Amino acid sequence: MKIHEYQAKEILRRHKANVPFGIVIDKKENASKAHDEVTSKTGGSVVVVKAQIHAGGRGKGGGVKVTKTKEDATAAVDKILGMQLITPQTGPEGKKVLKVYLEQGIDIAKEYYLSILLDRSIRKTILMASTEGGMEIEEVAETHPEKILKIAVDPGIGLQVNQARQLAFELGLPAESHKSFQSLVMAIYDAYIKEDASLLEINPLILTKQNEIIAGDCKIDLDENALYRHADNAAFRDITEEDPLEVQASEFNLNYVKLDGNIGCMVNGAGLAMATMDIVKLAGAEPANFLDVGGGANKTTVTNGFKIILGDPNVKGIFVNIFGGIVRCDMVAEGIIEAAKAVDLKVPLVVRLQGTNSELGREVLNKSGLKITGVDDLREAASTIAKLIK
């Protein structure tokens, strides 16, 4: 689950990490009061106004402004709050800014990059750092891979202070900043583990002119499967930042991810769903979604799935690919027929049924009188739906 920067920094504060003071607002009339509170609390005059959206590259899109007066800060809030912010990560449609974060300005000497994530290939947590802070780490990896440092953390013993110290030396940090750096690294690792995060990224990690290390910006992705252990973090969910169809799918307990194609896919099982999307692309078409209905491919589930798929105006056809293990294909077929009637299906529908009672399921579809194309072979089924939408 993605969260906003101000929420990520709230998590870091729980774990005693050094982060700037800031206040989040969602009304323009609160800008002046928030500015005064930040400056009086910190004793500084510089306030950074930051758009709060679930996407990076906010500065490039005009979503981050450094201000030195109250007038400049309120003007920045007036411009940013409510704007449609377009960044390299939002796509051309952008995201509407519903909250802004007013944060104390930091006296920056140098910017670095620091993150913690899981490397599944070695089954260890990785601490990753770079001297190229403030840049997209993907760009650094492509142009200067030698500038990315990695330290693997044994999950049995966790991050050790000597590893944080090693990283400080490898980054070339001034000796006066090592204690501050080690303290922050240990704090964010503690946050990453105890909050069940899947990613914790600080970019930029700031070295101040006073040799203090501060988390200038922070991104945290939380493991949704662990939110039952963190009621406070679950409350961070902002559905206004999520795709409306994905929100609706979660209400139906469906695993749905919207994509950019035009063939809606409904499959039982995540592995088969990914294979189905691959075969659709090989057929020369593009999947419009990932949709795993799991073991509950019944009338209600299929109907809800069709509603979600058809909620995307780009969908020109639907490909249902079901393997009957526990679930019976004849029951699925009945669900498909009822669902097609319930949503008044107008687009081509190709169905592939294999497994338990698959022959009976195909017979049910053939007798339905509906325009449903049944295909046994997976490659042929993908080619069929690709041809039908042309």
From Swiss-Prot:
Note accompanying the cofactor annotation: Binds 1 Mg(2+) ion per subunit.
Reaction equation(s) it catalyzes: succinate + ATP + CoA = succinyl-CoA + ADP + phosphate; GTP + succinate + CoA = succinyl-CoA + GDP + phosphate
Residues annotated to bind ATP: 50, 57-59, 103, 106, 111
Domain ATP-grasp: from-to ranges: 9-248
Keywords for the protein's UniProt record, in alphabetical order: ATP-binding, Ligase, Magnesium, Metal-binding, Nucleotide-binding, Tricarboxylic acid cycle
UniProt-listed Enzyme Commission number(s): 6.2.1.5
Cofactor(s) the protein needs: Mg(2+)
Annotated Mg(2+) binding sites: 203, 217
Gene Ontology, cellular component aspect: cytosol; succinate-CoA ligase complex
GO biological process: succinyl-CoA metabolic process; tricarboxylic acid cycle
Ranges in coiled-coil conformation: none
Alphabetized Pfam families for the sequence: ATP-grasp_2, Ligase_CoA
Taxonomy, superkingdom: Bacteria
Positions contributing to substrate binding: 268, 325-327
Functional pathway: Carbohydrate metabolism; tricarboxylic acid cycle; succinate from succinyl-CoA (ligase route): step 1/1
Entry-linked HAMAP family: Succ_CoA_beta (MF_00558)
Protein name as annotated: Succinate--CoA ligase [ADP-forming] subunit beta
Organism whose genome encodes this protein: Leptospira borgpetersenii serovar Hardjo-bovis (strain JB197)
